[in-house]
């Protein structure tokens, strides 16, 4: 099974979310279902239907989190080199198409946040820059149009 590469912070968030589901949300939804059953006929019971739908969504999220927690690798545990771009690296790149410099951090898919310039290794840009060295020019292959970037500096 594939591993999820996540940060320690994201791991802690997932553990807290799972704990809240198991200790707070699941008992609450179980109580809602019990109360709805006591109302009688379940065939036309909107409260029961809503609670069942919420329970299904909660179970799906619980299963997703458990899958991640059973198959993760911490970013901090991945061997990093300052000679080449790897997960956790912060780099300055120059995008030739946009005539624009930017600083990005390469992260696992669970930690990506494009608005904070945290780019997943699984994106076209992430795949293009990983294992590259300072000064490398790479082509980023996207569905729309490929473009070139230069790795100006590996900051961290």
From Swiss-Prot:
MF term (GO), any: DNA binding
GO aspect biological process, one term: regulation of DNA-templated transcription elongation
Keywords: Coiled coil, DNA-binding, Transcription, Transcription regulation
Keyword Transcription regulation assigned: yes
Coiled-coil stretches: 1-84
InterPro entries according to UniProt: GreA/GreB_C_sf, TF_GreA/GreB_CS, Tscrpt_elong_fac_GreA, Tscrpt_elong_fac_GreA/B, Tscrpt_elong_fac_GreA/B_C, Tscrpt_elong_fac_GreA/B_fam, Tscrpt_elong_fac_GreA/B_N, Tscrpt_elong_fac_GreA/B_N_sf
Reported function: Necessary for efficient RNA polymerase transcription elongation past template-encoded arresting sites. The arresting sites in DNA have the property of trapping a certain fraction of elongating RNA polymerases that pass through, resulting in locked ternary complexes. Cleavage of the nascent transcript by cleavage factors such as GreA or GreB allows the resumption of elongation from the new 3'terminus. GreA releases sequences of 2 to 3 nucleotides.
Family the entry assigns: Belongs to the GreA/GreB family.
NCBIfam families on file: greA, PRK00226.1-4
Name recorded for this polypeptide: Transcription elongation factor GreA
Species: Ureaplasma urealyticum serovar 10 (strain ATCC 33699 / Western)
Lineage, highest ranks first: Bacteria, Bacillati, Mycoplasmatota, Mycoplasmoidales, Mycoplasmoidaceae
């Amino acid at each position: 099974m594939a591993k999820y590469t996540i940060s320690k912070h994201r791991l802690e968030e997932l553990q807290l979310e799972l704990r809240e589901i198991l200790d707070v949300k699941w008992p609450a939804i179980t109580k809602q279902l019990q109360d709805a059953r006591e109302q009688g006929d379940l065939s036309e019971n909107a409260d029961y239907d809503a609670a069942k739908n919420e329970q299904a969504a909660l179970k799906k999220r619980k299963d997703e989190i458990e899958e991640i927690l059973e198959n993760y690798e911490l970013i901090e545990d991945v061997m990093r080199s300052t000679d080449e771009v790897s997960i956790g690296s912060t780099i300055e790149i120059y995008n030739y198409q946009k005539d624009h410099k930017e600083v990005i951090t390469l992260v696992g898919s669970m930690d990506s946040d494009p608005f904070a310039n945290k780019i997943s290794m699984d994106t076209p840009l992430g795949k293009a820059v990983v294992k590259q060295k300072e000064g490398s020019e790479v082509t980023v292959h996207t569905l729309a149009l490929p473009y070139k970037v230069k790795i100006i500096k590996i900051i961290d």
